[in-house]
Amino acid sequence: MLQEPSAAFSLRRNSFRRRSPRSNVDDRGWNPLHIKARKGDLKSVKQLLDQGMDVNALAWGPKSKGVSALHLAAEGGHIEVMDLLLERGANIDAKTWGSCGWTPLHAAAKERKREAVKFLVENGAFLADDITDTRFNPPVHYCHGLEWAYEEMKKLNSESSSSSGGDTSSSSDN
């Protein structure tokens, strides 16, 4: 009698393995790419992308409405994984669904992953002061760590403008 459940489990496990990795999702709606990106497993993320997983696939679970692998890598502060995902075409400004509309930059800021925020801003992530959600609340309303992201972005912008500004006297010449 113990052999029947064991055999049934073995059959289910083997049939699960035969399915395409694109169809495997957990109770959060995460596929293997989401899971490996959140863990920061660069080798596995590369393998999954090489096997054809969609770099912009979104998770659809009770608490994962539109979360991408880039959101999860940013949340974990996994720079190398984020770099690979962007290299493969991940949307740097992908927004989650629902009232928040968080981008990967929001996710990194919420977890106070300074290097991830810096990396995203340097790679073109957009975070305007006037972004609002469907309730007209700015992201800072939902994420107490976001004030820091705005400060980091301003700091990076001022550093880049001061390094590229060089000679400003040409406009004041008479």
Curated annotation (Swiss-Prot):
Effect of residue 16 to P: Abolished phosphorylation by PHYA. Impaired repression of PHYA-mediated PIF3 phosphorylation. Normal interaction with PHYA, but decreased interaction with PIF3
One example GO MF annotation: phytochrome binding
Modified residues (Phosphoserine): 15
A GO cellular component annotation in the UniProt record: nucleus
Gene3D superfamilies assigned: Ankyrin repeat-containing domain
SMART domains per record: ANK
Keyword Nucleus: yes
Region feature (Disordered): 1-29
Presence of the UniProt keyword Nucleus in the record: yes
UniProt repeat feature ANK, residue ranges: 28-57, 65-94, 100-129
Subunit structure and binding partners: Interacts with phytochrome A (PHYA), both in Pr and Pfr forms. Binds to PIF3, a repressor of photomorphogenesis in response to phytochrome-mediated light signaling; this interaction may trigger the repression of PHYA-mediated PIF3 phosphorylation. Interacts with SIGE/SIG5 in mitochondrion. Interacts with RPS9M (via C terminus).
Classification via PANTHER family: ANKYRIN REPEAT DOMAIN-CONTAINING PROTEIN 39-RELATED, BRCA1-ASSOCIATED RING DOMAIN PROTEIN 1
Entry protein name: Phytochrome-interacting ankyrin-repeat protein 2
Organism: Arabidopsis thaliana (Mouse-ear cress)
Gene coding for it: PIA2
